[in-house]
């Protein structure tokens, strides 16, 4: 996909998508604030789209100060934004969300999207796939690279297959901890201390525990599973 609109004809219309359902919602908002401040207004027209913690797409604030990390900003409300999947690249606003025959208006026909979502639903290939379906150019890795890069277990498998050195690990699929906890404990014990227990598909250091005593392993696994049923030790 390419950005067909020339900057000499008009400003490039950039949709910033931020917030989201992950535990890094506030950090994503702060990222949007930084990008808003950095984009040259003579070259780019910014279209802010926020995603609430429960997954609603809404018109986002256009003032970067309102999204500063120091304010721990969250996206909570706004007119619903819908993304057309008909290759028109249009974002449509429903001014009467939930109503019958609500008024809809075109917010913008965007040239490119900057996905500024952190963690699940933002860096894992999901929004990238949605934008591919809508035929909207976007910044960043594609679906496969995003999905593989987000999944720590998949990435280790790919690196090992490419002949690169990979540290020893234990992959714990969703049902294994429930059905074979003793087996997981035994494999983890064989790795030696300290252990790092991680959600396989969470961003930053969310849900990660450093284990220096095997008596703390169960609690670390349960903490990681709060963020992802697949975990890595």
Regions inferred by a protein language model and the residue ranges of each:
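Conserved N-proximal alpha/beta basic substrate-recognition cap immediately N-terminal to
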Residues: 10-13, 24-33, 37, 41, ...
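Short flexible/disordered coil segments
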Residues: 75, 119-122, 178-179, 230-233
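Active-site nucleotide/adenylate-binding loops and adjacent lid/helix of ATP-dependent enzymes
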Residues: 2-17, 22-23, 30, 103, ...
């Amino acid at each position: 996909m390419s950005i067909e609109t020339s900057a000499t004809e008009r400003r490039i219309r950039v949709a910033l998508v931020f917030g989201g359902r992950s535990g890094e919602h506030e950090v994503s908002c702060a990222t949007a604030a930084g990008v808003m401040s950095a984009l040259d207004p003579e070259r780019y027209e910014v279209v802010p789209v926020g995603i609430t913690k429960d997954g609603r797409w809404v018109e986002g604030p256009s003032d970067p100060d309102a999204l500063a990390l120091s304010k721990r900003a969250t996206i909570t409300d706004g007119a619903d934004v819908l993304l057309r999947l008909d290759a028109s690249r249009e974002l449509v606003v429903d001014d009467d969300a939930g109503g019958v025959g609500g008024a809809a208006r075109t917010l913008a026909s965007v040239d490119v999207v900057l996905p500024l979502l952190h963690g699940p639903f933002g860096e894992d290939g999901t929004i990238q796939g949605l934008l591919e379906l809508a035929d909207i150019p976007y910044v960043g890795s594609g679906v496969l690279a995003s999905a593989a890069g987000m999944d720590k277990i998949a990435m280790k498998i790919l690196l090992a297959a490419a002949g690169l050195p990979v540290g020893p690990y234990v992959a714990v699929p969703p049902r294994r901890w429930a059905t074979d906890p003793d087996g997981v404990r035994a494999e983890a014990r064989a790795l030696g201390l300290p252990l790092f227990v991680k959600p396989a598909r969470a961003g930053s250091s969310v849900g990660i525990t450093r284990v220096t005593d095997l008596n703390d392993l169960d609690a670390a696994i349960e903490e990681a599973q709060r963020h992802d049923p697949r975990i890595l030790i």
